[in-house]
Amino acid sequence: MLLTALNAISPIDGRYRSKTKSLSAYFSEEALIKYRVQIEIEYFIGLCELPLPQLIDFNPSLFEELRSIYLHFTSDDALQIKEIESTTNHDVKAVEYFIKKEFDKLELQDYKEFIHFGLTSQDINNTAIPLSVKNAISEVYLPN
């Protein structure tokens, strides 16, 4: 079904779409998935910087490659995560599995078990959502 003002869930993405379109980069499901990926990656980097003993040999020069996972996040990446979610029936777990696949591509298999280490889904959501609000305010509502 094509999204129109008549079949949208709310007037925000229906009748007012022309005024709220820029907010989809912050508040759409794809955006939430991207923010979750960002939080998971930055948390992993934070564990490396502690340094957590098991991550002490992680090369900090790889941090930018890790960040590129969310900095270059695409709609196809979001679709991959949704496909994983269709198996896991868990949105945040699907993000974790996606990142583990990305670690495999980067040949970082030895560190995969520290993705989402010590976290709950609420830890991710309760950080991702406020970050999306903060960014929307600074980049859309109150731009420089």
Predicted features by range, described:
Residues 2-144:
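A helix-coil-helix interface module used to build multimeric assemblies
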